[in-house]
């Protein structure tokens, strides 16, 4: 069974037209714990691959309205440095901060605005903090940010289930208020997300 763990109902509505018979959709709610719980539930109910799709923030050369595949994710608010000396984002059972995801075969061929494969930073923050920017971009090398993706990938890694993810960027650091950009671009980006979902997901069935 192919399962989709999606944070918000508006994102779920964008993905629904792409679902095929046998697919299941789990609307988790926002944040890492919600996303992890929904992912675990999906796996317990028989999912053998997990997909996470939605809107995200961006850094650097990403574009508003662009669609990007996630090849690895990191929890940038996970920090055990004072306990065991590991770098920010390194989970207790890992040697690297990066959680690998599966690539979506042929994505660049079917999604018109596909911008390539990126690193996603996930944390329970929605803000414009400068220290987050430095950590995410310079230390961790991420160009996408959300509040769920790495948690979904973390559970999948622990359970041995393939995880796929793609994001549509609504706001880019340096382009003005993050909240203002998100509100201005949300509906357009949901439309782009819907088209990308149909192109990617129908092709795989």
Descriptions of predicted regions:
Residues 3-5, 48-52, 144, 163-165:
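Short glycine-aspartate micro-motif
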Residues 163, 168-205:
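Regulatory input/activation interfaces that engage signals or partners
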Residues 41-45, 62, 154-162:
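Alpha-helix C-terminal capping segments
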Residues 47-58, 148:
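A short, hydrophobic beta-strand-centered structural micro-motif
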Residues 59-140:
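Mid-sequence, gly/pro-rich, charge-dense loop/helix-turn segments that line enzyme active sites
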Residues 125-181:
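A C-terminal functional module that forms or caps the active site or interfaces directly
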Residues 1-45, 63:
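N-terminal short beta-loop-beta anion/metal-coordinating cradle
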